[in-house]
Amino acid sequence: MNTPEPRLHHVTCASPVGLHRMAYWEWGDAANPRVVVCVHGLSRQGRDFDTLARDLSSDYRVICPDVVGRGRSGWLPDPRLYGVPTYVADMVTLVARLNVPEVHWVGTSMGGLIGIALAAQQGTPITRLVLNDVGPVIEPGFIPRVLGYLGVPAFWRTLEEAAEATWAISRGFGPHTLEQWQALTRHQLVPAEQDGPAGKLSGFKPHYDPAIAVPVRAAT
C-alpha cells in the first residue's frame, strides 16, 4: 500500500568496534519486489529523496537510508570508520534485510561512491546504477570547500535561517523555490539550545555527527 509519508525502520549493522543502528525510510508497497535504493550525499540524509521517492512509490518499493552518523541513525565511536568501506558493509546488511535479490541504486555524491563500490563487488545486488553529482574522480577543490562547513559548529534560531545557510552552500545545484529550500533543510535539523545574553536560546543544529569530518580532513 502506498503512503503519503515514509515508514521509518532500523537495521543493526556491525563494525570493527561493535554494533550500530542504521535508519532507513521506506516508501511504497513493502511486498513489491521492485526496489530502488536512494543514498544521499556526505552531510545529508534520506529525506532528501522525498519528492523522487513519492513519485516512484506507485511502481517501486523505495528505500532511503540515513547513512550512519546522519539523520536518525546512530553515531560511530571511532570517527576513522566513517568511510566507504563501512558504508558499503552497512548497505549489504540493509539489502539482506530487504530480502530481495536485486535493487536499482540512485546515489548522490557520497551515495554514488557507495553505489560504485558496491556495484563492483562480485555477486552485487545492483542491476542499475544512477549517479548524481559524482564520478570516479573527486575534483581537487571539493574537499577544501566541504571543510568550510562540514563539522563546523552551527546554530540557527529558525528554519528560515537554516534554509538560507543551505542555499548558500548548495545554490549551485540548480534553481529551487524558497519552499523547496525549506523542505530540503527541515530534515537536516535537530532541536538545540545556545547561551544568549538573556538565557538559553532555542533553535536548531545540524543532524549529523560532527566527527564525519575527521576522515575528510585527514584526506587533505
Question: Whereabouts are the PLM-identified features?
Answer:
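Conserved hydrolase catalytic core segment
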Residues: P101-F142
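A catalytic-pocket lid/entrance helix-loop region that shapes and gates access to the active site
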Residues: N132-E161
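Active-site loop/oxyanion-hole signature of alpha/beta-hydrolase fold enzymes
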Residues: P16-G18, W25, T51-R54, C64-V106
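Serine-hydrolase catalytic-loop signature spanning alpha/beta hydrolases and amidase-signature enzymes
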Residues: G41-T51, V62
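Alpha/beta-hydrolase
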Residues: E164-T220
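Alpha/beta-hydrolase active-site loop signature
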Residues: S43, V67-G71, P136
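Alpha/beta-hydrolase fold catalytic core
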Residues: M1-V36, S58-Y60, V100
